[in-house]
Amino acid sequence: MSKNYHIAVLPGDGIGPEVMAQALKVMDAVRSRFDMRITTSRYDVGGIAIDNHGHPLPKATVEGCEQADAILFGSVGGPKWENLPPESQPERGALLPLRKHFKLFSNLRPAKLYQGLEAFCPLRADIAANGFDILCVRELTGGIYFGQPKGREGSGQYEKAFDTEVYHRFEIERIARIAFESARKRRRKVTSIDKANVLQSSILWREIVNDVAKTYPDVELAHMYIDNATMQLIKDPSQFDVLLCSNLFGDILSDECAMITGSMGMLPSASLNEQGFGLYEPAGGSAPDIAGKNIANPIAQILSLALLLRYSLDANDAATAIEQAINRALEEGVRTGDLARGAAAVSTDEMGDIIARYVAEGV
């Protein structure tokens, strides 16, 4: 008998509810085709939670997430809540506390150039023609963003500001394991990004990554300095499989990876803890300007579901089925408005219907 899974669904604001509805259609198709027992509960988060409960992350939402196997998150924020105090705004008051509460230390951001979308890639046509499929694995809770001491002191010409890059062995070991385990599900290559020619923290990073690599003899490991990595991503992104990055370097490279795909509407994201519990969300924002118009691209939300299936439910076949269905839709020229470039475009609902049907059919 198959295991029972429960997913906390947090649609949020803007286009969140529209694109989430499409992901849930696809989840229905996965249930049927793979005989998976998946239940869901829906909770308010972000601006809608402020309106309904007076707080961007209500206690009931947190408790519901605690009872779930994973969180499928939409998007939060919008002009309506921009004038609230920063800590009460949807983004800072909901997403960051969720990451902290569940100790989500790793961020996974896939960046893939899909066949038929090469024209959207800002790289040279001959580079785009080679395609790329990269997974950026970023450490989320350590490094210079959180290291102490940090601050400002002094005055006049002696005024100074300082931040501290700190990494502990356990922090590097656990993010490295995420990268190597991810590579085993892909093309078995990890490129670890550092600045070991200058920084002590990067020297330790490289030493520990080398140690972890010994337990993954089936995965190829390469090291690359951050400055070279930013150039190589432009020169030949097809050389990369999994990028393993510290918090700061991952912040930079994950956005560069996203930009060279040419479409934020295609990019999912996963944040995981040590137990495999994760929060899965589109990399883009709530897009309030197009909310309610049935024109948003739901693929990033649907791909977030695929990541959830792969990393939190260990349902790799189901995740692959979703990715194959999306590939088929795009290869057949099915496009939402952001990808149509003047050609006929389908609605948000229609794109969800097509992908769900292809998942059910087993393309």
From Swiss-Prot:
Top-level enzyme category: oxidoreductase
Which of this chain's residues are annotated to bind substrate? Answer: 99, 109, 138, 227
Pfam families found in the cross-reference section: Iso_dh
Cofactor: how and how many bound: Binds 1 Mg(2+) or Mn(2+) ion per subunit.
The reaction(s) catalysed by this protein are: (2R,3S)-3-isopropylmalate + NAD(+) = 4-methyl-2-oxopentanoate + CO2 + NADH
Judging by the UniProt lineage, the source's domain of life is Bacteria
Q: What are the binding positions for Mg(2+) in this chain? A: 227, 251, 255
Q: Where does NAD(+) bind?
A: 78-91, 285-297
Q: In which pathway does it act?
A: Amino-acid biosynthesis; L-leucine biosynthesis; L-leucine from 3-methyl-2-oxobutanoate: step 3/4
Residues the record marks as site: Important for catalysis? 145, 195
Which EC number(s) are documented for this chain? 1.1.1.85
Q: Which GO terms label this protein's molecular function in UniProt? A: 3-isopropylmalate dehydrogenase activity; magnesium ion binding; NAD binding
SUPFAM superfamilies, per database record:
Isocitrate/Isopropylmalate dehydrogenase-like (SSF53659)
Cofactor (UniProt): Mg(2+); Mn(2+)
Q: Where is this protein localized, as stated in its record?
A: Cytoplasm
Keyword NAD present in the record's keywords: the answer is yes
| Gene Ontology terms: cellular component | cytosol
Q: Which UniProt keywords apply?
A: Amino-acid biosynthesis, Branched-chain amino acid biosynthesis, Cytoplasm, Leucine biosynthesis, Magnesium, Manganese, Metal-binding, NAD, Oxidoreductase
Q: Which function does this protein serve? A: Catalyzes the oxidation of 3-carboxy-2-hydroxy-4-methylpentanoate (3-isopropylmalate) to 3-carboxy-4-methyl-2-oxopentanoate. The product decarboxylates to 4-methyl-2 oxopentanoate.
Protein name per Swiss-Prot or TrEMBL:
3-isopropylmalate dehydrogenase
Which organism is the protein's source?
Salmonella paratyphi A (strain ATCC 9150 / SARB42)
